[in-house]
């Protein structure tokens, strides 16, 4: 999939939103990518995730035996990437504020894992998911996302990162947000903090 095709799919599904948003990272932005609107269509989810894993070098891809993504946003992404790779898919959840594998999910010692996300901004959720994988005995081989909106600022502790699309989107700390300065109030469309 080309960058233009990914953006077109997000636009077609009403998933590329403009306004004043409070992101899961705590940053503010005038653009929000609501991946759930794209992932609600199985064909779109399958196409995006197959393209994600196709971007991982063959030698690395062959070593992946499990895909893990943080709930909520990456549950479907993990599943579809696992299906595209022919491996199982797990997800992490918050327990006492920390990402962990629950529901009886286990990783074999040293099992090769691909950690996935729908969107990365600071990479915080991805790093938390990676820590949960490591704590469970897995080996993080790489990370991937449908869209990296970090402008290259995401760092995954040396693990290679293979986003399908790099999309520079403006973000601000709350104190520096021009939309807040103009009297606007951000909306929080993401899933972090939901109970």
Swiss-Prot record:
Its EC number is 2.4.2.10. One of its GO terms (biological process) is pyrimidine nucleobase biosynthetic process. 5-phospho-alpha-D-ribose 1-diphosphate binds at residues 117-125. Keywords: Glycosyltransferase, Magnesium, Pyrimidine biosynthesis, Transferase. GO terms for molecular function: magnesium ion binding; orotate phosphoribosyltransferase activity. It catalyses: orotidine 5'-phosphate + diphosphate = orotate + 5-phospho-alpha-D-ribose 1-diphosphate. Pathway: Pyrimidine metabolism; UMP biosynthesis via de novo pathway; UMP from orotate: step 1/2. Homodimer. PANTHER family: OROTATE PHOSPHORIBOSYLTRANSFERASE, URIDINE 5'-MONOPHOSPHATE SYNTHASE. Belongs to the purine/pyrimidine phosphoribosyltransferase family. PyrE subfamily. This is Orotate phosphoribosyltransferase.
């Amino acid at each position: 999939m080309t960058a233009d095709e990914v953006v077109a799919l997000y636009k077609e599904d009403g998933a590329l939103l403009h306004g004043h948003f409070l992101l899961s990272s705590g940053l503010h932005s005038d653009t929000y990518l609501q991946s759930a609107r794209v992932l609600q269509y199985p064909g779109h989810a399958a196409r995006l995730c197959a393209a994600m894993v196709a971007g991982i070098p063959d030698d690395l891809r062959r070593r992946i035996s499990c895909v893990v993504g943080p709930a909520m946003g990456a549950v479907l992404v993990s599943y579809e990437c696992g299906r595209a790779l022919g491996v199982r898919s797990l997800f992490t959840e918050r327990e006492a504020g920390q990402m962990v594998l629950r529901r009886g999910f286990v990783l074999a010692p040293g099992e090769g894992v691909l950690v996935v996300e729908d969107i990365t901004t600071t990479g915080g959720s991805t790093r938390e998911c990676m820590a949960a994988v490591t704590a469970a005995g897995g080996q993080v081989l790489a990370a991937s996302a449908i869209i990296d909106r970090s402008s290259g600022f995401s760092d995954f502790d040396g693990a290679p990162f293979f986003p399908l699309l790099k999309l520079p989107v403006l973000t601000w700390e709350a104190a520096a947000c021009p939309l807040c300065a103009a009297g606007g109030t951000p909306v929080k469309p993401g899933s972090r903090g939901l109970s």
